[in-house]
Amino acid sequence: MKILVTGFDPFGDDKINPAIEAVKRLPDEIAGAQIVKLEIPTKFNVSADVVKDAIAKEKPDYVLSIGQAGGRFELTPERVAINLDDGRIQDNAGYQPLNHTIHGDDENAYFTQLPIKAMAKAIREAGVPSAVSNTAGTYVCNHIFYQVQYMRDKMFPDIKAGFMHIPFLPEQVVTRPETPALSLDDDVLGITAAIKAIVSRDGKGDIETIEGKDH
């Protein structure tokens, strides 16, 4: 089994992004699966091409994209990607789409193929906070989540794909009072646990456990 794991470069006012820092520290093999690590740019109109080229070259069984979610205190496997770009800030190319559809002729939303409940449970059992999330936002994280699902639907039907957000690092919240943070070691531990869950649930689907939310 081969798993492509992507992480974004820094964006906005931050000089570091825990996503790519954690991805770079992952081992090359987890639970018998080969781990291919890829840095992608925080740019709406570029990131998808970088991932598409990597999928075509590596032919992974799974794609797990990792992104930063400042303000969250846990690792959050994402349930659904929506067909919308609505940038809170400009991306790293200076582009800020507002209420743009990603693909005008396609699905309003795609659901992940990853066992997100099993992933969240495995992360917590590793001692790292985690919960399933039902919104990946409308910035480049949701964009790449949707784009990879679109690629799966149109070009790479054999892959399974999804997205997971991770919190700020401690050094990112020095001037952000009361903002949650998680250490890089915990990020790596949590992502590793999530990947182990993906491998263990391959061909079995997700587990049946309560992860729903009222809002």
UniProtKB/Swiss-Prot annotation:
Give EC number(s), comma-separated: 3.4.19.3
Q: What does it catalyze?
A: Release of an N-terminal pyroglutamyl group from a polypeptide, the second amino acid generally not being Pro
Which Pfam family, an example, fits this chain?
A: Peptidase_C15
Record key words, sorted: Cytoplasm, Hydrolase, Protease, Thiol protease
What Gene3D superfamilies does this protein map onto? Answer: Peptidase C15, pyroglutamyl peptidase I-like
Q: Name one GO cellular component term.
A: cytosol
Can you tell me where the transmembrane regions are? Answer: none
Q: Which domain of life is it from?
A: Bacteria
Which catalytic residues are annotated?
Answer: E78, C141, H165
**First-level EC class:** hydrolase
Tell me the GO BP annotations in alphabetical order. Answer: proteolysis
Q: Does the keyword Repeat apply?
A: no
- Report the InterPro entries cross-referenced here: Peptidase_C15, Peptidase_C15-like, Peptidase_C15-like_sf, PGP-I_bact-type, PGPEP1_Cys_AS, PGPEP1_Glu_AS
Q: Where in the cell is it found?
A: Cytoplasm
* Single GO term (MF): pyroglutamyl-peptidase activity
NCBIfam families given for it?
PRK13197.1, pyro_pdase
Record's subunit section: Homotetramer.
Give the family from UniProt: Belongs to the peptidase C15 family.
Protein purpose: Removes 5-oxoproline from various penultimate amino acid residues except L-proline.
What name has this protein been given in UniProt? Pyrrolidone-carboxylate peptidase
What is the native source organism of this protein?
Lactococcus lactis subsp. cremoris (strain MG1363)
